[in-house]
Amino acid sequence: MTVVKGEGSISFAEASVEKYKNDAAFTNPLTIVGDGVVTYESSDPTVATVNATSGEVTIVGVGTTTITATITDTDEYAYEKKTASYELSVDPAINLAALSGDYIAQNGDVLTGTLAGNYKISIAAGASVELKDITINGVDDEAYKWAGLTCLYDANITITGANSVKGFYEDYPGIQAGPVGTTLTISGTGSLTATGGDDAAGIGSGYDGASCGDITICGGTVTASSAGYGAGIGSGYNASSGAITISGGTVYASSSMDGAGIGSGHKASCGDITISGGMVTASSGDWGAGIGSGFSGSSCGNITITGGTVNASSSSYGAGIGSGFSGSSCGAITISGGTVNANSGQYGAGIGSGSDSTFGSITITAGITQVQATRNYATAAWPIGKGFSDNDSGAVSIAGVTVTSKDWDGTGLTDLNFATSSTGSNNLTWTLTPKVP
């Protein structure tokens, strides 16, 4: 008697699988027709190993390997094709979604994915790390007192794709820059949105005595904001940060209230602010400067703009570029290049001091492309110079001409054109452009 065997077959659910190097063990389901016995093997065990009987794959390295299932004929079934296989590619990136605890990124790491747990993610001292489509959405919970991303010392962050980082708990920034004396550098072609809590910067330092080193942005699209009393980029409430340098990229920085868009937070300080390139938009909701110092005795170092396109505004009481409201200060303001538009909603100067505050000095040279400054308080504030109730600030020099009044009409200028415009009794704009030879 001739026994006719059934026609057996095997096939994997997926012909190819992509994983990250820290992903958990997995199984690509195998469909079996018949009762044959299957064994599994990996073509490159340095990339991944496979359990010979269950098919569970464990990732051990990066690269590509082929996982093969082999089946044998039985008394009941014959298999014309006795093997099935799929290609496994293991990306060297660290998948945040696969983490089961805190993680310190090392030099060369690529971070990707969405953080699933309430874990602290840090960057090791001196490490260069790529952020590639990450999401860290910190919960506002006192049990998790850390930033969305914490730099332990000097750090270089390259951004690719779209990235979003939010601090945990209200006292912590989206990205905590390293300690005093270190530098955080952000570059790349992607985007980064960094959001701090009520009392912290978007990028910089946190709350009440917190500090950080220097912050440099030279590429990418960076959006940084504080939900309350911190700067968008710089220091948090009653905190400090080092120098802030922007040489390229597109930067949007904002504080909801009391902090500067770029600079210091409420009762806080920051170092020098230098902008030499890029597209920069900075704003304060109330009482802080767009670029400069925040509210209530805050300070910042010198503000220097040599290039790029800069738009800076304060909704009320702070200067567009300069100092915030109520006993705040900034150092020397120098604008020698680029296109600048600075506006104070009320009581502050467009460029200079906020209400009841001071600046060191203002120097604008003939090397600019255009400077436009607007005040919105007629009785005292200057478009470029002093805000309301400022009796102590330094000199204002525009292309070598000393400006001594909010009523200046451009007299004495030889290298710059001067124009005024107004949209109402409180509003006054000065516009400076180079004279064409």
Role assignments for model-derived ranges:
Residues 1-92:
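Solvent-exposed beta-strand/loop surfaces, strongest in extracytoplasmic domains of secreted
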Residues 91-437:
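A composition-driven surface/loop motif
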